[in-house]
Amino acid sequence: MIMKVHQVQEKKMNKTYYLISSLAPKSESLKPLIKKELNKKLVEVDDPTVADYLFINGGDGTFIKNAIKYDRAGLKIIGINGGSLGFYTTFNETNIDQIANNLDQLKYTQLDFIRLQIDDQIHHALNEFNINSTTAYGYDIFIDNEFYQKFRGTGLLISTTTGSTGINKSANGAILFPRIKAIQMVELYPLLHSSFTTIQSPIILPIDTKIRIEIKENYCDHDACPRIVADGAVIRQGLSSTTIEISATRSQADYVATTDLRSYIQRLQKTFIY
């Protein structure tokens, strides 16, 4: 039974949880099993903004979307693999029955997000920001206010350590292991010829680095102008004559730490090799 907020306040000793599940068949089949296990130790509430724990049952896409949406201090977020990819998940169908007993033993940490500011708007991403266009476009790139290069191509990808196994990997970026505190920038399809070239390599920057991207061209068809995609969702389109500022920031919520080398390597092997 889901308890209302006022009912929970009468039972302050009980830790509370809210469960989010994707609509994937695997996720739907796991949902009743997860609730049965969680109800052994926690009280379910109908409002995620008052829960002590947020459980996300699905793949990495479901996890990322809701981790950004519900990020707040005091919340612990735990992923359960009810989808396909599960780099952010701690439990799956083989060990759901161990969730309740392991809650107090789990190690938690804050995650690195990427903060992007354009005009007066601020956005956050857990995996990456993808600045791209359908045609080659010019960008002036600055690193900590030092001019880095003039880039012309279809876009730039800026990712976190945890996001390095996502689109970043598909774009030939490096996979960063969990204990590496960094952000990574990858060029997307640079335009190269005898009078114009770029570094053409991913760069891995210290976590406190600030990146500034200046788009100076103010002429293009709206559909061909650069757009900004945050973790797969388009947040701005038709960019011209503007400046984008990017830096890392810490999440407010706590997540299960994934610093164990062996388990991370096994996850890489299972996902990309075997």
Curated annotation (Swiss-Prot):
Q: What is its EC number?
A: 2.7.1.23
GO CC terms in record: cytoplasm
Per the entry, what this protein does is: Involved in the regulation of the intracellular balance of NAD and NADP, and is a key enzyme in the biosynthesis of NADP. Catalyzes specifically the phosphorylation on 2'-hydroxyl of the adenosine moiety of NAD to yield NADP.
Highest taxon listed in the record's lineage: Bacteria
Q: Which reaction does it catalyse?
A: NAD(+) + ATP = ADP + NADP(+) + H(+)
Q: Which NCBIfam families match?
A: PRK00561.1
Q: What is this protein called?
A: NAD kinase
Spell out the Pfam families in the cross-references: NAD_kinase, NAD_kinase_C
Species of origin reads Mycoplasmoides gallisepticum (strain R(low / passage 15 / clone 2))
